[in-house]
Amino acid sequence: MHHLTKLTMLQKDKSAAIGFIFITMLIDITGWGIIIPVIPKLIEELIHGDISEAAKIGGWLTFAYAITQFVFAPVIGNLSDKFGRRPIILISLFGFSLDYILLAFSPTIVWLFIGRIIAGVTGASITTASAYIADVSTAENRAKNFGLIGAAFGLGFIIGPVIGGLLGQYGSRVPFYAAAVLCMVNFLYGFFILPESLKKENRRPFDWRRANPVGAILGLRKYPTLIGLIAAIFLLYVGSHAVQSNWSFFTIYQFNWDERMIGISLGIIGLLVGVVQGGLVRFINPRLGNEKSVYIGLALYTIGMLLFAFATESWMMFVFLIPYCLGGIAGPALQSVVASKVEPSEQGEIQGTLTSLMSASSIIGPPTMANTFYFFTHDDAPFKFAGAPFILGGVLMLLSTVVAYFSLRKHRA
């Protein structure tokens, strides 16, 4: 009886911990979401150029953030395996506050790059949050709990861009002040509320070989059976940048949207992502199984991308979001398969590696998509076709489906 009570209390503690990490992620993503609708306008102001040029700079800004995150994510992941998740998450949140303050006061485009580099160094909250979730999950509820990170993204993107779009009407820098305040609130919340998830006996010494970003990817050689799945995840990440990096610039160019409209549309994307990742994943994935979830999700992503490419009216973008966002069942399913193949003491490392891959995809994806957009929209373009990045994204999603198919078939054999 006493053992049962203890078990119930332990489960309650784990549920509370997942609740805490969900709120921390939610506030983090909301701060990030707030600045998205105004980035195009701020870049245009600082470079005195048009939206086509601003898109190209926007791609390189994301590249600067991603390349620093790529270098530092495995370092941070391994530090969290040694010192625990809590201190690392708190340092990350503090770094983001500093980034937003720098962006708010930036007199030149160089300042934007410096701010993004600082955020890249400390932007490990997702790595550490993923490891945190792995710490407090069982094999049965791991996919469901990873889905909660997606739901925090979704909710943060409902609240953030809508606030950012509305605040952006008072000036392109106002949302940055709001994001900085929000990040400091999150830091304080984490400081007083967030419990540690990594038990002392599950910690391990810091190792520079494991903390090397290229080493983190080469470390995958330990898991040869996972290479195909990781490649499918990588292609999925790169392809999704057709939407992530392009949405604001595409809709400004194609439909002349303002910050408010961009904010509302991103809020709707967030709502749909939240419904899919926080709700549907819990029902669909266990019923379909991870394998079918991967195929159906990737097919829906591909269809959504191709529809965006040929949209001619604003309302079409909203309708086409439905198949695209339903594709979100693929990510947690792939992540769940990968996480189930490694030991508890290695979750921090494998999540750090996945974040490194996400960052590597952000090194390739945004400049590729932004330059594709620029190539087909600038004044001397061979022919004008703003939807070109979506076509490229759709092709990458198709490739991801093929790679996932062969890899999962091998796992069955």
Locate predicted features:
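Juxtamembrane intracellular "pre-TM" segments in multi-pass secondary transporters
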Residues: L4-S15, P195-A231, Y253-Q254
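Short amphipathic helix-loop junctions that connect adjacent transmembrane helices
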Residues: V38-A55, S245-I262
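Conserved MFS/SLC helix-loop-helix module at the cytosolic interface between two early adjacent transmembrane helices
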Residues: F70-I109
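Helix-to-loop junctions at the C-terminal end of transmembrane segments
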Residues: V71-G84, V276-N290, F373
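Helix-breaking motifs and short loop linkers at transmembrane-helix boundaries and internal kinks
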Residues: G84, F105-P107, T122, N256, ...
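Cytoplasmic helix-loop-helix junction between adjacent transmembrane helices
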Residues: G115-G154
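A membrane-interface helix-boundary motif in multi-pass transporters
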Residues: G168-V181, N371-M397
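C-terminal transmembrane helical hairpin of 12-TM major facilitator-type secondary transporters
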Residues: E291-L334
